[in-house]
Amino acid sequence: MQLFHLCLIISCTCPTIQASKLCLGWLWGMDIDPYKEFGATVELLSFLPSDFFPSVRDLLDTASALYREALESPEHCSPHHTALRQAILCWGDVTNLATWVGTNLDDPASRDLVVNYVNTNMGLKIRQLLWFHISCLTFGRETVLEYLVSFGVWIRTPPAYRPPNAPILSTLPETTVVRRRDRGRSPRRRTPSPRRRRSQSPRRRRSQSRESQC
């Protein structure tokens, strides 16, 4: 299996240093977390069960439908677009290598091992990575991070003390907006005091002017 990893690294042609870290470190098993620079961690993603993530094919179709123009653009759009490009390129190289190994291995057992390893281990990591960056682009990074924390708290709470259904990512933006509005109310309540002071100042000036006239 280490030989397979070595072939994977040699064949991976990702264009940037960050993508090289993804292929050399994350898929190799080094302690490199591709989510840290985005405020998340591998452990935070691991709270989501494997069947939560759509298939790679569905995720690639979603990325193409929503962000194809930005992904194909030579310009730098955002770190999430860049990471998404790199993940797509890495997965393409992984599948090409797995296909090559599968067609050139005479032993059916070894062929099945390679295919299962790619689909189970590397496939899950790529599904997590694609889902994370697509979700950040769609809902916003802060919303996704809030969802991961909420789901982590929910899944670790005993069933008797938690809601029956897990949090839903698509409903979090509504609660986020409400919270922002609630946070914005406190300064608004404080604003009348300076206004009253300002409104009082002309009155005082008028009273002073009247006294001077008298």
Curated annotation (Swiss-Prot):
Propeptide positions: 186-214
Q: Where are the sequence repeats?
A: 186-192, 193-200, 201-208
> How is the protein modified post-translationally, according to the record?
Phosphorylated. Cleaved by host furin.
* Bias type Basic residues, positions: 178-207
Going by the UniProt record, its keywords in alphabetical order are: Disulfide bond, Host nucleus, Host-virus interaction, Repeat, Secreted, Signal, Viral immunoevasion
Site annotated as Cleavage: where? 185-186
Q: Report the sequence similarity comment from the record.
A: Belongs to the orthohepadnavirus precore antigen family.
Signal peptide coordinates: 1-19
Q: Which domain of life is it from?
A: Viruses
Biological process terms from the Gene Ontology for this record are: microtubule-dependent intracellular transport of viral material towards nucleus; symbiont entry into host cell; viral penetration into host nucleus
Region annotated HBEAG sits at 25-27
Q: Which organism is it from?
A: Hepatitis B virus genotype A3 (isolate Cameroon/CMR983/1994) (HBV-A)
Q: Which Pfam family, an example, fits this chain?
A: Hepatitis_core
Q: What is this protein called?
A: External core antigen
Which terms in the Gene Ontology molecular function aspect does this entry carry?
DNA binding; RNA binding; structural molecule activity
Which parts of this chain are annotated as the region Disordered? 165-214
Region (3 X 8 AA repeats of S-P-R-R-R-R-S-Q) spans which residues?
Answer: 186-208
InterPro entries this protein is in? Hepatitis_B_virus_capsid_N (IPR013195), Hepatitis_core (IPR002006), Viral_capsid_core_dom_sf_HBV (IPR036459)
Where does this polypeptide localize?
Secreted; Host nucleus
The job of this chain, per UniProt, is described as: May regulate immune response to the intracellular capsid in acting as a T-cell tolerogen, by having an immunoregulatory effect which prevents destruction of infected cells by cytotoxic T-cells. This immune regulation may predispose to chronicity during perinatal infections and prevent severe liver injury during adult infections.
Q: Can you state the subunit structure given in the record?
A: Homodimerizes.
> A Gene Ontology CC term for this entry?
T=4 icosahedral viral capsid
